[in-house]
Amino acid sequence: MNSAKVNPSGHAPTPAPTASQGAAFPANRYALFFGLAIAGGALDLWSKEAIFRWRGLPGTQDVYWIIEGYFGIETAVNIGAVFGLGAGQGLVFAAISVFAAAAIIAWLFFFKAARSCWLTFALGCITGGIIGNLYDRLGFWWKPGLPDQWQSGVRDWILWQASDQWKWPNFNIADSLLVTGAIMLLVQSFFFPPPPHGEADGNELPGRRAPDEPTEGTKPAAS
């Protein structure tokens, strides 16, 4: 039987909060985050293995154009960070990736940031990208006979260019997940205010009023 708090003013009693209302965040946030992270990382690793098996190592075949002159498939090994930045620091970026993944999990589930569905989705994408690239940075794909500098390099295969003079560095699905998550975080910071403490936002739009919340100027029903 549900208990209710008696309002001294004589207005309708306020129902006691249920267990789900008192929870820090919905339990399905675990499934959302870890599902995205694992699926994203697995898709990235599968795609890299399949493309490199099909197209070979960098420099062995010409570009396979999907949209001639603009978008295609070309294998490459990136020994830097995202889009080739920081070349030669693969192990440093691997250490940063491990720290970032641990910090994300702590932020979501220990500091309760998982109250936000949007934020959970964004960080799930980022973690999936971290997993995909971390596997390569730790050298799990590398085999004896390959160049030593590739041992902490990341396999890339997506080619996009606006023209022959303007070519974007090759990237992969993990990079795409990282960028998608980063864009979502920017959108979150500009358009989605954080939910009140202890309240999960679910799929609520910013500023949306809860169904039982009285509007300004209305009075509660008398008992």
UniProtKB/Swiss-Prot annotation:
Family membership noted in the UniProt record: Belongs to the peptidase A8 family.
Transmembrane segments: 32-52, 65-85, 91-111, 116-136, 173-193
Protein name in the entry: Lipoprotein signal peptidase
Region (Disordered): 1-20, 196-223
InterPro entries assigned to the protein according to its UniProt record, in alphabetical order: Peptidase_A8 (IPR001872)
GO molecular function terms listed in the Swiss-Prot or TrEMBL record: aspartic-type endopeptidase activity; endopeptidase activity
GO biological process, one term: proteolysis
Keywords from the UniProt entry: Aspartyl protease, Cell inner membrane, Cell membrane, Hydrolase, Membrane, Protease, Transmembrane, Transmembrane helix
Location relative to the cell: Cell inner membrane
